[in-house]
């Protein structure tokens, strides 16, 4: 049955614009629209967040650019189109951009986009910080001042001043229950204490009373205090092994020698024997004897406690001054004087000005050298090898005494220097009365051209002048009684002051101010008074073989060099024994020289060194003489017969040292 009804209004849905509902417009009670401001929602951080990949202008993706090095493009964009490579700039464009663009220095090339990116000030500052080793963050200070909140200031009030709770002052009920249970267990006998350990019986100490110091007397305490342990037995050596090496076993000759020797003379008190195994070694038959001798040694041999002084070795060395404070002394090799062939055995310097140097060598020549230039200005050919030369100490005479092999001594006129002095020397040689000598004289004088020649009975080792220049002495090489002769030039006479042999004479020298003669044998030096012909003093040198001798300017000190490598300083006013004995050389000392003006002393040796000493001699008896080594000089080479430096002398006015060598050279050392 159809019924009629009124049509109900159908509610239609409002169309959405752009798929969104239109917001309702708020109205008031009268139906008028209200002016409502929209509420701004907080922005979502993911709406504006973007990664580095999304910010790239070249959206080819995060792929290596080198994949497209051989292609004409650098990738594809989001639409699939090829992205062409940007055109490369030429050198001219790059140069123009560098000149015209003021921001060129802050641009970098970005491989991802293929373009130049301009760096900001913040980025540049970060780069500078990284390059200089600083933190990249701008303005970051890693050393901020530490703010000590609690201990920087002294507080008078506590930080937490809450009062103690009341429960702290009330006894604990739990503890009360525990104590009551323990008391009840003790009353009932349930609580048991720790078990007592059974004491084990102790061993009786037999020596307890010996160790106790209660009943020890004072004498026993003193003996205990100074007790010295017995020396230990020496450890066995290889020879005492049951299987020693073959070199420790005796052969027939050594066995016979050991059996024939006395017990005290034997190096070993047993004969080494060899066994293959330790089980084959028999019982030692001398065991009880050695133990008994050991007991006798401990019982009879007294022991002595030696107090050792623990001192630093450097404290025992004397304090040496700075060598720079002791200058001048020779330090540098100035030049060599070459001309001799073979050994240069002797040299002598003109004693007043030191302008001339005379040298004699194994080649039989005597050469005169200019000291300033080292040039040889004159040469004398002798009839034998020259052994000694000596300039006359008189200033106005150009005399030179030369000893050479063939048993001759010659007095030469060097012919060098002042012409007036040369003429006076020629006149002196011509006026020497060689014809007035007695018949049968041991030493004969004769004139030969411009020189005097003395025929000696033996080969001459050395010639030396007296300070006044009229007397000179000669020493023979042979060990005979008449080995020393004193010659007087003004009378052309020679005499032997010693008729008895006192030893093998090695060197002689005159006292510089008195009529005395020093004669050096191998181990002694004797001082003779020539005026009274008596022995003044005999000196004990301590050398085993004296080789050279020299005196100071006053004749109060004597300097000796020996073939036993020793150098001795004899102070004649202190006694007959050396004041100083030094052993700075490793070979024989050949010559000693003392400077006339400076406190300098020199020794030369076969080890190829010349030792220079600072030798100060005081006239004040309250001061001791000073001797300090200051320099070691080297200039000559050692020959096959182990000879090197043979002679030395000082320049009379300068601190210059002249040395001769077996290599045929003459060396001059200056400061």
From Swiss-Prot:
Q: Where is this region: Disordered?
A: 1-36
Classification via InterPro entries: BOP1/Erb1, BOP1_N_dom, WD40/YVTN_repeat-like_dom_sf, WD40_repeat_dom_sf, WD40_rpt
Taxonomic superkingdom: Eukaryota
Keyword rRNA processing in the entry? The reply is: yes
Compositional bias (Basic and acidic residues): 15-36
User: Matching Pfam families, A to Z?
Assistant: BOP1NT, WD40
Show the GO MF annotations: ribonucleoprotein complex binding
GO cellular-component terms in the record?
Answer: nucleoplasm; PeBoW complex; preribosome, large subunit precursor
Per-repeat ranges for WD: 339-381, 383-422, 424-455, 456-497, 500-538, 584-623, 640-671
Q: Which residues form a coiled coil?
A: none
Q: Respond yes or no to whether keyword Ion transport is given for this record.
A: no
Subcellular location(s) per record: Nucleus, Nucleolus; Nucleus, Nucleoplasm
GO-annotated biological processes: maturation of 5.8S rRNA from tricistronic rRNA transcript (SSU-rRNA, 5.8S rRNA, LSU-rRNA); maturation of LSU-rRNA from tricistronic rRNA transcript (SSU-rRNA, 5.8S rRNA, LSU-rRNA)
What are the alphabetically sorted keywords of the record?
Answer: Nucleus, Repeat, Ribosome biogenesis, rRNA processing, WD repeat
Its family remark reads:
Belongs to the WD repeat BOP1/ERB1 family.
User: Which purpose does this protein serve, as stated in its record?
Assistant: Required for maturation of ribosomal RNAs and formation of the large ribosomal subunit.
In its UniProt entry, what is this protein called? Ribosome biogenesis protein BOP1 homolog
Originating organism: Caenorhabditis briggsae
Biological classification of the source: Eukaryota, Metazoa, Ecdysozoa, Nematoda, Chromadorea
């Amino acid at each position: 049955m159809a019924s009629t009804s009124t049509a109900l209004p159908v509610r239609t849905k409002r169309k959405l614009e752009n798929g969104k509902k239109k917001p309702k417009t708020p109205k008031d009670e009268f139906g008028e629209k209200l002016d409502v401001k929209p509420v701004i929602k907080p922005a979502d951080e993911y709406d504006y967040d973007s990664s580095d990949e999304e910010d790239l202008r070249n959206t080819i993706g995060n792929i290596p650019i080198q994949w497209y090095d051989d292609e004409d493009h650098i990738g594809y964009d989001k639409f699939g189109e090829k992205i062409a490579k940007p055109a490369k700039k030429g050198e001219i464009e790059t140069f123009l951009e560098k000149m015209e663009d003021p921001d060129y220095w802050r641009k970098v090339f970005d491989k991802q986009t293929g373009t130049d990116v301009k760096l900001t000030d913040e980025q540049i500052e970060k780069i500078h910080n990284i390059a200089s080793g600083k933190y990249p963050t701008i303005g970051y200070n890693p050393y901020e001042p530490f703010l000590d909140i609690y201990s920087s200031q002294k507080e008078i009030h506590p930080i937490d001043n809450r009062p103690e709770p009341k429960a702290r002052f009330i006894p604990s009920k739990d503890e009360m229950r525990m104590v009551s249970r323990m008391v009840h267990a003790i009353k009932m006998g349930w609580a048991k204490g720790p078990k007592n350990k059974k004491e084990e019986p102790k061993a009786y100490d037999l020596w307890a009373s010996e160790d106790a110091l209660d009943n020890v007397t004072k004498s026993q305490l003193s003996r205990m205090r100074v007790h010295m342990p017995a020396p230990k037995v020496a450890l066995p050596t290889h020879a005492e092994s049951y299987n020693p090496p073959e070199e420790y076993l005796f052969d027939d000759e050594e066995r016979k020698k050991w059996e024939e020797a006395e017990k005290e003379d034997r190096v070993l008190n047993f004969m080494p024997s060899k066994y293959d195994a330790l089980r084959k070694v028999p019982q030692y038959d001398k065991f009880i004897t050695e133990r008994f001798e050991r007991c006798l040694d401990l019982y009879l041999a007294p022991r002595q406690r030696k107090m050792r002084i623990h001192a630093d070795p450097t404290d025992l060395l004397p304090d040496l001054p700075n060598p720079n404070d002791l200058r001048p002394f020779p330090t540098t090799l100035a030049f060599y004087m070459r001309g001799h062939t073979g050994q240069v055995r002797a040299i002598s310097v003109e004693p007043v000005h030191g302008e001339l140097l005379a040298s004699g060598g194994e080649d039989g020549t005597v050469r005169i050298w200019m000291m300033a230039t080292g040039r040889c200005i004159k040469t004398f050919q002798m009839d034998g090898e020259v052994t000694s030369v000596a300039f006359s100490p008189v200033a106005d005479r150009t005399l030179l005494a030369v000893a050479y092999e063939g048993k001759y001594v010659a007095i030469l006129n060097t012919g060098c220097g002042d012409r007036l002095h040369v003429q006076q020397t020629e006149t002196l040689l011509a006026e020497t009365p060689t014809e007035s000598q007695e018949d049968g004289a041991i030493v004969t004088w004769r004139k030969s051209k411009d020189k005097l020649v003395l025929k000696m009975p033996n080969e001459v080792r050395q010639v030396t002048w007296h300070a006044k220049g009229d007397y000179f002495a000669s020493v023979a090489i042979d060990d005979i009684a008449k080995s020393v002769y004193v010659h007087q030039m003004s009378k052309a006479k020679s005499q032997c002051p010693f008729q008895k042999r006192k030893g093998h004479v090695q060197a002689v020298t005159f006292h510089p101010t008195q009529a005395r003669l020093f004669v050096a044998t191998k181990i002694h030096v004797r001082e003779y008074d020539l005026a009274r012909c008596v022995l003044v003093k005999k000196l004990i040198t301590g050398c085993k073989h004296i080789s050279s001798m020299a005196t100071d300017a006053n004749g109060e000190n004597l300097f000796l060099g020996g073939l036993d490598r020793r150098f001795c300083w004899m102070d004649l006013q202190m006694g007959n024994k050396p004041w100083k004995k030094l052993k700075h050389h490793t070979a024989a000392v050949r010559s000693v020289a003392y400077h006339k003006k400076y406190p300098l002393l020199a020794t030369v040796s076969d080890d190829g060194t010349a030792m220079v000493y600072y030798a100060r001699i005081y006239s004040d008896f309250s001061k001791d003489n000073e001797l300090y080594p200051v320099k070691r000089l080297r200039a000559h080479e050692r020959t096959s017969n182990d000879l090197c430096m043979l002679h030395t002398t000082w320049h009379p006015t300068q601190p210059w040292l002249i040395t001769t060598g077996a290599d045929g050279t003459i060396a001059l050392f200056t400061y």
